[in-house]
């Protein structure tokens, strides 16, 4: 088996679909010797900021001298990004070897595993073989029935900002969504919550009490955010002063405050994480595709906001970083998202939109998306490909800023197309 064949196997149609439940993952892991039982975890759930918070915590734990696994989704450029040890992606040959190891077990299961369950098993196997001392594990969807929730009590359960997303799978209210996320809270494990949504906070507090789990809510009154530049955001948080965070979204200091709070809670439970390591980890973290500046002048931004809650934060960042400016937006959005709410937030900042269809069956067709945009009185045109869309958006932008956003699923293609366009 080569890398392409391994990828074909992972993405094979027989694993397609979303089937909640932990039985299949447990069966698959048992056949592989239960590698997850050899590992310790930080488990991260939430609507927005999961990946950024996980990346920050992994960076800080690595700076503290630990061997750290990081499991995230989706990827931006290459699948291997989803499984990293100490900031290094799983090598192709290791991935092939592990797929060959998993295949006999997966192929003989009566209740067929999903793609995400196969990838979760792959990650667990790799982290165990790599002898990771701690794994930062990002939930795929929800919490309670997500395949990552096969783990025993984590060293810390972290719940990021909550908002309305995936209501079809998780339920129609913030309380339902919070209940799904709170499913990662295990008996007696420390919990750190972003908080700030009373309906959701009440659910998390109740579950933490039921599970005798020590709950810490982030004290954002101790966060002093100094604004920032197009290179870094500067902030102070609870004694940690003048931190230069290279993730420049205005919302990132709040994610950093959550990460810092969780790391300090872990320290009280015996983890050796000095303040100097927290600073180093935050100042050296890399997390592509989240309010990422690909070019300074004229500005070209790439952002992964893919729901109304995230879009609100991105729009605020655009206003903070580019005061008074209007944008050409290159947009693709999944058809199952609250498209109109997202567009209503973008419309006031738009000069024009260019729509494309991301390479996933869930994407709203570019022409349909353009019709939605025109309903807001904005000019919109479609492009036949992501490459053509990037070229057109840059052309329309002229000396003004361009921002590509709406889904993480086109981030890699946009990045590659932009690199090709400007390399000459």
PLM segments and residue spans:
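ATP-dependent carboxylate-amine ligase catalytic core
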Residues: 18, 22, 26-37, 63-152, ...
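Hydrophobic alpha-helical packing residues
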Residues: 57-62, 127, 346, 373
């Amino acid at each position: 088996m080569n890398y392409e064949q391994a990828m074909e196997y992972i993405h094979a149609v027989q694993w397609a679909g979303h089937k909640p439940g932990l039985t299949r993952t447990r069966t698959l892991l048992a056949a592989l010797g239960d590698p997850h039982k050899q590992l310790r975890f930080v488990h991260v759930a939430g609507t927005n900021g999961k990946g950024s918070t996980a990346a920050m915590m992994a960076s800080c734990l690595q700076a503290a001298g630990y061997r750290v696994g990081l499991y995230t989704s989706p990827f931006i450029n290459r699948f291997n990004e989803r499984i990293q040890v100490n900031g290094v992606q799983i090598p192709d040959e290791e991935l092939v070897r592990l797929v060959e190891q998993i295949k006999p077990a997966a192929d003989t299961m009566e209740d067929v595993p999903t793609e995400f369950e196969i990838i979760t098993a792959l990650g667990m196997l790799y982290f165990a073989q790599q002898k990771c001392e701690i794994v930062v594990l990002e939930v795929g969807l929800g919490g309670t029935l997500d395949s990552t929730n096969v783990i025993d009590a984590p060293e810390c359960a972290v719940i990021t900002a909550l908002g309305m997303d995936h209501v079809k799978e998780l339920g129609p209210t913030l309380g339902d969504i919070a209940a799904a996320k709170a499913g990662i809270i295990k008996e007696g494990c420390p919990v750190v919550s972003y908080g700030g949504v009373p309906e959701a906070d009440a659910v998390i507090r109740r579950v933490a009490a039921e599970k005798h789990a020590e709950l810490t809510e982030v004290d954002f009154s101790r966060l002093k955010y100094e604004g920032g530049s197009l290179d870094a955001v500067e902030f102070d948080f609870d004694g940690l002063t003048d931190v230069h965070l290279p993730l420049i979204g205005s919302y990132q200091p709040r994610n950093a405050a959550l990460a810092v709070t969780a790391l300090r809670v872990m320290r009280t439970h015996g983890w050796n994480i000095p303040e100097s390591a927290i600073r180093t980890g935050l100042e050296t973290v890399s997390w592509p595709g989240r309010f990422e500046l690909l070019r300074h002048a004229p500005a070209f931004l790439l952002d992964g906001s893919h729901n109304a809650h995230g879009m609100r934060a991105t729009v605020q960042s655009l206003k903070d970083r580019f005061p008074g400016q209007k944008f050409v937006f290159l947009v693709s959005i999944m058809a199952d998202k609250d498209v109109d709410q997202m567009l209503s937030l973008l419309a006031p900042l738009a000069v024009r939109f260019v729509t494309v269809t991301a390479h996933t069956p869930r994407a709203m067709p570019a022409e349909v998306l353009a019709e939605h945009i025109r309903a807001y009185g904005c000019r919109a045109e479609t492009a036949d490909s992501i490459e053509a869309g990037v070229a057109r958006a840059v052309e329309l932008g002229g000396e003004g800023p361009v921002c590509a956003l709406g889904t993480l699923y086109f981030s890699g293609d946009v990045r590659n197309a932009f690199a090709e366009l400007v390399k000459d």
